[in-house]
């Protein structure tokens, strides 16, 4: 059976108080002895009481004098570093409890004003009876929320993301984590055409793809080569093609009426499920046919100052824009 917890209060009965003193004093001496023996520290105890004229000491008078002299040899800062009496201990506890109470009151007030703010937004302002202090706190909370909203809007604008899009897209774009697609000229088993709707969308694609990268679409697909093998018969003049592409873009922007023909002729071949960044194998007869068609398309386009990217044939090819 467990002993009932003793209430920490002054004992008004003299006999009970004296008996409790003797019992507790003996227990205190025992605890000091155990602490000194188990932990190997130097300790002493001096107890004054109204029932005895001489104080009781532990372990002895000489032992107490030795411990006190060692304590006085320490610097004053070390002496008061962890020294505490009953009054100081109570003050520390009160200060700690007061700080905890202040922090909890602040959090509770913020939650209360947040609830009032959202209730007012949905038209339930009449259910609250707010005074001047409540209105000031509510105004402070509204200002904080507005600052957060404006800061997020500024972040989205700086990252180039339209308002309403996912914030994760803005973060990824600002950090440069969005990979650029690697376009490779190849055949695909499906026939899907995505048509360009406006000149602005085509300009976006033109800025998205490097003009130098468009050179690979102007040649028919060659035979299958290995990952580390490169065809030796492709002698491209990149500088000349880059200048031609610049003239082509300027011609397109100056003559928007040619956009319909341009969108019908332009496309990017998409990779099939091979997942290799090299040109796929095709039959030899099909290669000659593509070469002839692309040559005719290039001759026709040069006469109208427009450079098509691929041939107009869409059989067994995938186009995307």
Swiss-Prot record:
Species the sequence originates in: Arabidopsis thaliana (Mouse-ear cress)
GO biological process, one term: positive regulation of transcription by RNA polymerase II
Top-rank lineage group of the source organism: Eukaryota
Chain ranges of the MADS-box domain: 1-61
Miscellaneous comment as given in the Swiss-Prot or TrEMBL entry: Plants lacking AGL80 (mutant fem111) have defects in central cell and endosperm development.
UniProt GO molecular function: cis-regulatory region sequence-specific DNA binding; DNA-binding transcription factor activity; DNA-binding transcription factor activity, RNA polymerase II-specific; protein dimerization activity; transcription cis-regulatory region binding
Cellular location(s): Nucleus
One term under GO cellular component: nucleus
Name of the protein: Agamous-like MADS-box protein AGL80
Transmembrane spans: none
Annotated Pfam families: SRF-TF (PF00319)
Keywords: Coiled coil, DNA-binding, Nucleus, Transcription, Transcription regulation
Described function: Probable transcription factor. Controls central cell differentiation during female gametophyte development. Required for the expression of DEMETER and DD46, but not for the expression of FIS2. Probable transcription factor that may function in the maintenance of the proper function of the central cell in pollen tube attraction.
Quaternary structure and interacting proteins, as annotated: Interacts with AGL61 and AGL62. Forms a heterodimer with AGL61. Interacts with MEE14/CBP1.
Reported tissue expression: Expressed in the central cell of the female gametophyte and in early endosperm. Also detected in ovaries, young siliques, roots, leaves, stems, young flowers and anthers.
Coiled-coil ranges (or none): 89-114
InterPro entries documented for this protein: MADS-box/MEF2_TF, SRF-like_MADS-box, TF_MADSbox, TF_MADSbox_sf
Presence of keyword Nucleus: yes
Main location (coarse class): nucleus
